[in-house]
Amino acid sequence: MKFLTVAIVLAAAASAAPTKEVLPYPPVVAPPPYGGIAPDHNPPFGGGIPPINSGGLPPTNGAYPGGNNRHLCPSGLLYTNPQCCSAGVLGVADLDCKTPSSVPMNGADFERICAADGSKAQCCSVPVAGLALLCQDAIGTN
C-alpha cells in the first residue's frame, strides 16, 4: 500500500514538472507607425482625425467663464472681470453690475451688449452682489 502511494506521488510530481515548452510566446506587436491605428482595427471616423467640438464656445483665458476677454479687459490682477454697470461713483465703486447677457467677442460688441440693458461696459476688480469695486472702461470702447 505504501508502495502504491509513493508511486502515485512520484507520478503526480513528474506530470506537474515543467517541460521545455510550457506556453507559446505571445505574438510580438510593435506600436503602429507615427501614432496610427494598428492594421487589425477599424479606424474611427474613416481613418481621419476626429473633429474637436468645444460646445460652440470661444476659447477662454480663465477670467470670464465661457468667454474670451483677453481683448476686453487688461491682463493682470486688477480690472479683469467684464461687467455691465449702470452707475459709477468716482471710478471707485460701480452700482448694479452684472455679467454681460451674452459672450462679447470684442470691445465694441461688449459695449453694444451692455448698452442694450442701459449700462456701461466696465472692467472691474472685485464684483460682489451687484457692487463692483475699482472699475475702468473696457478696452475698445468709447
UniProtKB/Swiss-Prot annotation:
Keyword Phosphoprotein attached: no
Induction field: Expression is highly induced in the presence of root and stem powder of Shanxin poplar and under nitrogen or carbon starvation conditions.
Leader peptide range in chain numbering: 1-16
Keyword Disulfide bond among UniProt keywords: yes
Disulfide bonds: 73-123, 84-114, 85-97, 124-135
GO cellular component terms listed in the entry, alphabetical order: extracellular region
Family that this chain belongs to: Belongs to the cerato-ulmin hydrophobin family.
Subunit structure comment from the entry: Homodimer. Homodimers further self-assemble to form highly ordered films at water-air interfaces through intermolecular interactions.
Protein name (Swiss-Prot/TrEMBL): Class II hydrophobin 7
Source organism per UniProt: Trichoderma asperellum (strain ATCC 204424 / CBS 433.97 / NBRC 101777)
